């Protein structure tokens, strides 16, 4: 299966289990991999035969900057479900949601979750 990557997207959202996260908000990063057949796009040089990266970006933006949720797992599920539902050629997608600055003590680069979902 071929892959389209949209990586390093950054958004500001109000997600988390702590009141401070819901009030102050924080940065979130998203990496998205969509799996689909890209052979027709490569042969025809036609955008209609692939998926538009900008549309994938806006799906992620709308969800992360939208309704607050408690868990990054919920954000990832919503992104994956929307991508699989909205883009017919996509057969599988992987979504990684990264919290660069979670409100927990310690030294670390970030915390993240990653899910992979397929069309049924």
From Swiss-Prot:
Source organism of this protein record: Bacillus subtilis (strain 168)
Record GO terms (molecular function): dihydroneopterin aldolase activity
UniProt binding sites for substrate: 21, 53, 72-73
Keyword Lyase: yes
Protein name per Swiss-Prot or TrEMBL: Dihydroneopterin aldolase
Ranges in coiled-coil conformation: none
Keywords annotated in UniProt: Folate biosynthesis, Lyase
Recorded metabolic or biological pathway in which this protein acts: Cofactor biosynthesis; tetrahydrofolate biosynthesis; 2-amino-4-hydroxy-6-hydroxymethyl-7,8-dihydropteridine diphosphate from 7,8-dihydroneopterin triphosphate: step 3/4
EC number(s) per entry: 4.1.2.25
Organism superkingdom: Bacteria
Function: Catalyzes the conversion of 7,8-dihydroneopterin to 6-hydroxymethyl-7,8-dihydropterin.
One Gene Ontology term, aspect cellular component: cytoplasm
Keyword Lyase: yes
